[in-house]
Amino acid sequence: MLEAIKTFMILYTGMFAITNPIGAVPVFMSVVGHLPAEIKHEVAKKVSITVFITLTVFALVGQWIFKFFGSSIDAFAIAGGILLFRMGMEMLSGKLSSVKIDEEDVTLEEVAVIPLAIPLISGPGAITTVMLYMTKESPGIVILTIIAIGLTTYGILYSGNKIIERLGRVGVKVTTRMMGLILTSMAMQMIINGIKGAFGI
C-alpha cells in the first residue's frame, strides 16, 4: 500500500510538472476572465474532461502504437526525453505559452479543447509520459494519476482569478520555472534510462 502511494505521488508530481495547469491560467483567464462564474465552470470542466480523455486514450493504446511502428520503449524514452527537455528549457526561460487565440473566430467550447486542453495541458510531452508510465508502472495507478491531474486542472482553472491575485504574473512565471526545472531533470533521467536499455549498459 505504501509503495503504491509512493508511486502515485511520484507519477502525480511528474505529470503536474509536465501538464503545468498553473501555466495555463493566464491563457484561460484571457478568454473567460470577464465572463460569469457559471461559464468559467463549464469551460474549466470541459478542459479537465478533455485532458482526462486524451491522456487515458493514449495511455491505453500506447503499447499498440509501439508495436505498429516497430519502435522500442527505449527508443521512445530517448525521443520523449529530448522532447521533455526542450519543453523544460522553454519553461525555465519563463515562456507560459506560444499559443495564440483569435477570440472572434472560435467558440468557448473550441477553446476548451484547442488550445487549452490540447496541446497546452495534455501536449506531446504529457502524452509521451503517460505512454511510458503505462509500460513501467501499474496501469491502475497511472489511470488514477490521470484522474487526479484532470481534477487538479479543473480546480486550478476555476480558481484562476484567485491564483492570479495571489501569485501575480511574476508568481506564475516563477512557478513555471520551478516546474521547468523538475521537468528537465525528469527528461535527463528518461534519456539516460533509454540509452542504458538500448545499449544494454
Swiss-Prot record:
**Top-level division of the source organism's lineage:** Archaea
Q: What is its main location?
A: membrane
Give a yes or no for keyword Transmembrane in this entry.
yes
UniProt membrane topology term: Multi-pass membrane protein
Where, by residue number, does the polypeptide cross the bilayer? 8-28, 49-69, 73-93, 111-131, 140-160, 181-201
* Key words, A-Z: Cell membrane, Membrane, Transmembrane, Transmembrane helix
- Asked whether the UniProt record includes Endoplasmic reticulum among its keywords, one would answer no
PANTHER family documented for this protein: UPF0056 MEMBRANE PROTEIN YHCE (PTHR33508:SF1)
User: Could you identify this protein by its name?
Assistant: UPF0056 membrane protein PH0760
- Natural source organism: Pyrococcus horikoshii (strain ATCC 700860 / DSM 12428 / JCM 9974 / NBRC 100139 / OT-3)
What lineage, starting at the top, does this entry show? Archaea, Methanobacteriati, Methanobacteriota, Thermococci, Thermococcales
